[in-house]
A protein has these predicted regions:
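C-terminal regulatory/interaction module of P-loop NTP-utilizing enzymes
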Residues: 1-295
């Protein structure tokens, strides 16, 4: 498969950064460059970072910029090839055989209508129309990672009843990892890699203003300061960008309904903290945190 030297409408990392911004995703220069190179070189893009920094949103935005459908494969412990590739619709196959009665031996039960496509097979069959997102690959086991490595080597699978299916062009593949475990070095070598950090305060404020409609700049700045303080606390789950956006929206909504700003932030704390122990830990500290954030 030929390497892509150009991408329609995206001639540089800066052009991709601008296109992502138009799709309401604020990428920095490092991320837009990594994504551009992955697309141009025809290599998978591996995005690592803490939960909530925008890895999955980046994949969605890239698919939107390319005008393609996002095929999301959510990984979990115990995921296997059947969940990622395909299954046969056994009940429909049996129904088709029963309906034919004595002629059942002439029924082809391996036609497309009986094939249940999973994301990886769909990507192979329609690579020009899709972006494959393999989300949270670190949650899968080493066996699935080995299977994935083989898939990424030649973008081909074999269905015993149908033969080999190979992508006619190199698909766009994005992998994400929260780094709960180390990925195999061979998998990393096949990818263009980028680590997504928590955004700098000014950039996080711009993200909130872009994604949270109706939020005033003062409220956005207060959220950024308060969330930054929360991230320095020993919490089970530190708030990510999505929680910051939702907190800004929730506090603004309560303020519009008559709550004063500090109370609006205090009452909507469950939007930004999603763990009981974290709420208990922060409760006696929230007033000082809000005061420090100049709420």
């Amino acid at each position: 498969m030929a390497v892509r030297h150009t991408i329609v409408g995206i001639g540089s990392p800066r052009a991709l950064e601008d296109a992502l911004r138009a799709a309401y995703y604020l990428a920095d220069d490092e991320l837009s460059t990594a994504a551009y190179l992955a697309l141009a070189l025809g290599k998978p893009l591996l995005l690592e970072g803490a939960p909530g920094v925008g890895k999955t949103e980046a994949a969605k935005a890239i698919a939107g910029v390319l005008g393609r459908t996002l095929l999301r494969l959510q990984c979990y412990e115990g995921i296997d090839a059947a969940a990622a590739l395909y299954e046969w619709n056994f009940p429909r196959q049996m129904l088709a055989l029963r309906q034919q009665g004595d002629s059942a031996e002439h029924v082809d039960i391996y036609r497309d209508e009986f094939l249940i496509e999973r994301p990886m097979l769909a990507c192979l069959r329609r690579p020009e129309d899709t972006v494959l997102l393999i989300d949270e690959i670190d949650r899968s086991d080493h066996e699935f990672e080995a299977f994935l490595l083989e898939f990424l080597s030649d973008f081909q699978i074999s269905i015993p009843e149908r033969g080999a299916i190979r992508a006619h062009e190199r698909p766009v593949v994005i992998l994400t990892s929260n780094r709960t475990r180390e990925l195999h070095e061979a998998l990393r070598r096949r990818c263009v890699y980028h680590w997504i950090e928590d955004p700098a305060p000014e950039r996080e404020m711009r993200i909130i203003m872009m994604r949270a409609s109706g939020v005033a700049e003062r409220a956005a700045r207060a959220v950024v300061a308060a969330v930054g303080r929360l991230r320095r606390e020993p919490l089970a789950k530190h708030p990510g960008i999505s929680e910051a956006v939702e907190w800004a929206q929730a506090a603004t909504l309560l303020n519009q309904q008559g709550a004063r700003w500090p109370d609006a932030f205090r009452r909507s704390l469950g939007v930004v903290l999603k763990d009981e122990d974290d709420l208990v830990h922060i409760a006696p500290r929230i007033d000082a945190i809000l005061q420090e954030a100049q709420v």
